């Protein structure tokens, strides 16, 4: 059974990101466009809570139900919400196209109802040596966010 979700991102960064998963064992395809980003890499994560009452700050930490350290999307040891970086061209919208086999739209670890956060700085993927590397990737301020919601199939 196919599952689809959507996230409308607001803040200094704005955009729409779509999620699609063919079944519970398939990777999730994440595609969309985001505007308002400076040229370069920006951390892109799923955070624990779908609460944006205090802007992006109330979305909590990265979604991490398995209690792992922060890492790259290809690392075995990573938060489920660690989707790495998106690359902004600086002269137009940033295209997002990620296939991730750790996140899911099904079951108890579903990302539906949680928040996507776009960060001001690059995610160092847990390898930067900064005190925040193993928790946030030292990705800086939260400049855009939105709650992931179920959408019509």
UniProtKB/Swiss-Prot annotation:
EC numbers, comma separated: 1.15.1.1
Cofactor note: Binds 1 copper ion per subunit. Binds 1 zinc ion per subunit.
InterPro entries to which the protein is assigned, alphabetical: SOD-like_Cu/Zn_dom_sf, SOD_Cu/Zn_/chaperone, SOD_Cu/Zn_BS, SOD_Cu_Zn_dom
Cofactor(s) required for function per UniProt: Cu cation; Zn(2+)
Residues engaged in binding Zn(2+): 62, 70, 79, 82
Transmembrane residue ranges: none
Keyword Zinc listed: yes
Enzyme class: oxidoreductase
Domain of life: Eukaryota
Keywords, ordered alphabetically: Antioxidant, Copper, Cytoplasm, Disulfide bond, Metal-binding, Oxidoreductase, Zinc
GO molecular function: copper ion binding; superoxide dismutase activity
Binding residue positions for Cu cation: 45, 47, 62, 119
Substrates-to-products reaction catalysed: 2 superoxide + 2 H(+) = H2O2 + O2
UniProt key word Repeat: no
Subcellular location: Cytoplasm
Disulfide pairings: 56-145
Primary localisation category: cytoplasm
A GO CC term attached to the entry: cytoplasm
Function: Destroys radicals which are normally produced within the cells and which are toxic to biological systems.
Binding partners and assembly: Homodimer.
Family affiliation: Belongs to the Cu-Zn superoxide dismutase family.
Listed name of the protein: Superoxide dismutase [Cu-Zn]
Organism encoding this protein: Chymomyza amoena
Gene name, Swiss-Prot/TrEMBL: Sod
